[in-house]
Amino acid sequence: MKAASIRNKGLRDLINNRYLYLLAIPAVLFSIIFAYLPMVGVLIAFQDFNPIKGLWHSEWIGLDNFKFFFRGQEWMTITYNTVFFNIMFIITGTILSLALAVMLTELGKSIVVRVMQSVMILPNFISWPIVGLFSVAFFTADTGVINQFLSTIGASTIDFYTNESIWPPILVVLNLWKTAGFGAIVYMAAIVGIDKEMYEAARMDGASRLQCIFRITLPMLKSTIVMLFLLSLGNIFGGNLDMIYSLVGDNTFLTDRTDTIDIYVFRALRTSGSLGMTQAIALYQSVIGFILVITANKIAGKLDKESALF
């Protein structure tokens, strides 16, 4: 009886909202064709894949492709680098985006603020290969802008492309420059939705601007912050291939501190040509990322139900 009632309720909902469901059909089809059907390719991770024989006739080798990746210490280094960079990107990006959003909102709707918003989001539309080309002009040992400036003031120059310890902060700063402005726009949209009467009531009680920010704005943004964090967490095992490879390339001097999973997969595919090994690494990356999202979502749901994605 209960199952029949649920079916009838679902059918009524389908009929009542038929036009909304029709609008969703293109997005559903797009997801099925480009996100779910390609997942059949995961089988390559368990095969000695031969393009001529195809997916269904290649030799099955079990977990041998995974053994190739996990047999040495290299996988620990690139996993650490991947997680480290993404955690730094998420933490610093969230803090700076929030700070920019709050500051610009407090400044009001002047022409200066609108110009600043346009300038902030501009780096988001510049591709990483273009940034990589500009970085050469800044970081080259002899003719780079930074080293020429250091020489002018009598300071010692820095050989950026052989000094691996300097690149983690460079990558974090460049990521902030490119993404923080766009992230601030998202938080500004959330701030606009906060009830203005709450601020008016707080000011009538004698609250300062700083108190309004910490007692009203930031607490009201909690759900948005958690939601964006959960979405970012899904990519914490993503290696930012376009960013890091555009800036560093195949520089062996910097491998230990800048190699991430995506770059390792890209290099392995070019050097070994084994699709099975690269797919095994990509599968490891995806499974760990999925587990992290599910775990973080459960924790967020227990702490605050409104903050969970599902």
Indicate residue ranges for each PLM-predicted region:
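A structural signal for multi-pass alpha-helical bundles of membrane permease subunits
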Residues: 12-310
